[in-house]
């Protein structure tokens, strides 16, 4: 019973990881949202964000 529970949890975790990877793979051509890695070789930030030169992340523009 204990090993069945462990296998079930591991299987569920693997399923969630694979689903996340598929979702990330589909978003290759999209723009980057909040805290998205930006810079050379990365997708550009969405129009409402700017790429922070200090951190290399998409963030809200400073006033």
UniProtKB/Swiss-Prot annotation:
Gene Ontology cellular-component terms for this entry are: extracellular region
Q: In which tissues is it expressed?
A: Expressed by the venom gland.
Q: Which GO terms describe its molecular function?
A: ion channel inhibitor activity; potassium channel regulator activity; toxin activity
Free-text domain note: The presence of a 'disulfide through disulfide knot' structurally defines this protein as a knottin.
The record's section on InterPro entries has:
Huwentoxin-1
**Record's keyword terms, sorted:** Disulfide bond, Ion channel impairing toxin, Knottin, Potassium channel impairing toxin, Secreted, Signal, Toxin, Voltage-gated potassium channel impairing toxin
| Proregion span(s) | 22-29
Name by which UniProt lists this protein: Kappa-theraphotoxin-Cg3a 2
- The domain of life for this entry's organism is Eukaryota
Indicate where this protein resides in the cell.
Answer: Secreted
Q: Write out the similarity annotation.
A: Belongs to the neurotoxin 10 (Hwtx-1) family. 44 (Jztx-4) subfamily.
Which positions form S-S bridges? 31-46, 38-51, 45-58
Signal peptide residues on this chain, from the entry's feature table? 1-21
Show the coiled coil region(s): none
Q: Which organism is it from?
A: Chilobrachys guangxiensis
Q: What does this protein do?
A: Gating modifier of Kv2.1/KCNB1, Kv2.2/KCNB2 and Kv4.3/KCND3 channels.
